[in-house]
């Protein structure tokens, strides 16, 4: 189940020029973005662990995105 609110998802889609966005479209994009976010978070956590830190920092996120 998607946890990302649907309103920002609809805004993102509408910013591309879409006039209307179906509920299914919002749900699909939200689910995909959550999956990608989880992958990035896992990798960032690994980066922090390698650096012997418990805290995930912005630089860990940036490096995780590059690694994926």
Segments predicted by a language model, with ranges:
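Terminal helix-to-tail segments of small alpha-helical proteins
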Residues: 1-68
